[in-house]
Design a protein with these regions (language model features):
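Flexible loop/hinge segments that line or gate small-molecule binding clefts
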Residues: 97, 120-162, 182-183, 204, ...
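An alpha-beta-alpha
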Residues: 163-204, 312-325
């Protein structure tokens, strides 16, 4: 069935059918007629024809670093709700924390002629900078504040500072830190900056030997906690950049008779389900991942409506959720 035949069946003009499928204005009566006809016939316009006419695919590419993480599905849920409301389809690419795959995904989506891209980035490298400058596709970065791009990100420094300060306020004076690579501007640089700010505010010196860098996994958190606590057994509280790292550190403590929170308090960022249900419930800063996804998608819709929109950044807040790992 072509558009002429469908319009005749629905009892409306071809122009009305076109406005309906392209999100234009229609009277309630005509919209109801077309919806009834769609249900009866299953008619959908040709995607190729729409692309030729509007130069739009009604598709948005979303690149994420780890589908199995606790945060990414929540962000994608928020993105998907806005895209659905706006009549867009979501194309998802999982890069498994591989920077090369992330860069390849950006190039693939550019060639696939998607209308826009939301990048849930793991790192910001010189290669990212070069590719983003020459992308020529509307893009919003989510979770990272990239220069020159529209971005939605979290107050990572504030979250880390609050989590660390909470333990110091309970009298702990030998804090340790397990972070992630500084190539990650938010989870790496900003959360470390927050940890350091908490120590400075408390009048405590920074001891590099009490600091370690892990990968984004529970296994790596376990390994780095082992090295850190064997090297500095007097550590009495530990800030971890992610819940996964914190859970690995907690597992090491349990296996080596280090009591949480009596011997070592532990806090982190993410407020994941596994952290909430850990053998010692984990104190963690709650980040609004679903809201971030919705806001990023809404920002992309603004870019698509007006390509001359001035790039802007939006930082979301957090709540520190205190639990038994910090004696709460």
């Amino acid at each position: 069935m072509n558009i002429t035949e469908f319009a005749q069946y629905a009892g409306v003009s071809k122009a009305a059918v076109s406005r309906y499928f392209n999100g234009g204005y229609l009277s309630a009566e005509k919209r109801a007629q077309i919806e009834t006809a769609v249900e009866a016939t299953g008619y959908r316009p040709s995607m190729q024809a729409q692309m030729l006419r509007t130069r739009r695919t009604r598709q948005v590419g979303v690149i994420l670093p780890k589908l199995s993480s606790d945060s990414c599905p929540r962000m994608v849920e928020g993105i998907g709700s806005v895209l659905e409301e706006s009549g867009y389809q979501l194309l998802l690419i999982n890069t498994a924390n591989d920077t090369k795959k992330e860069l390849q995904a950006l190039d693939t989506l550019r060639q696939h002629t998607v209308d826009g891209i939301i990048l849930i980035a793991a790192l910001y490298t010189p290669e990212h900078k070069t590719l983003l400058e020459h992308l020529h596709v509307p893009i919003v970065t989510l979770g990272q504040n990239f220069p020159g791009c529209c971005s939605v990100y979290h107050d990572d420094a504030g979250a880390a500072q609050a989590a660390t300060a909470h333990m110091l306020a309970k009298g702990r004076r030998a804090p340790g830190y397990i972070g992630v690579t500084l190539l990650d501007k938010c989870a790496g640089q900003q959360r470390r900056a927050g940890f350091e700010a908490a120590l400075k505010a408390a009048g405590l010196p920074l001891h590099p030997e009490r600091m370690a860098v892990a990968k984004f996994s529970q296994e790596s958190g376990y390994e780095q906690a082992a090295k850190l606590l064997e090297r500095s057994p007097h550590i009495d509280c530990l800030f971890c950049a992610t819940d996964a790292i914190a859970l690995g550190a907690m597992q090491y403590c349990r296996e080596h008779s280090i009591r949480i929170p009596e011997d070592v308090m532990i806090a982190s960022v993410g407020d994941s389900k596994v952290g909430r249900n850990a053998f010692v419930p984990l104190t963690s800063a709650h980040l609004h991942y679903k809201t971030a996804g919705r806001d990023a998608a809404a920002l992309l819709m603004e870019l698509l409506a007006d390509p001359h929109t001035v790039p802007r950044s939006q930082m979301l807040g957090f709540e520190l959720v205190c639990r038994e790992s910090t004696n709460d």
